[in-house]
UniProtKB/Swiss-Prot annotation:
Heterohexamer; disulfide linked. Contains 2 sets of 3 non-identical chains (alpha, beta and gamma). The 2 heterotrimers are in head to head conformation with the N-termini in a small central domain. Keywords: Adaptive immunity, Blood coagulation, Coiled coil, Disulfide bond, Hemostasis, Immunity, Innate immunity, Secreted. It comes from Bubalus bubalis. This is Fibrinogen alpha chain. A long coiled coil structure formed by 3 polypeptide chains connects the central nodule to the C-terminal domains (distal nodules). The long C-terminal ends of the alpha chains fold back, contributing a fourth strand to the coiled coil structure. It is found in: Secreted. GO terms for biological process: adaptive immune response; blood coagulation; innate immune response.
Length: 19
């Protein structure tokens, strides 16, 4: 997790998963 739920959500939407 990057620390921000919003960031994780964006990555998940892109298909990159949690970074």
């Amino acid at each position: 997790e990057d620390g921000s739920d919003a960031v994780s959500g964006e990555f998940l939407a892109e298909g990159g998963g949690v970074r």
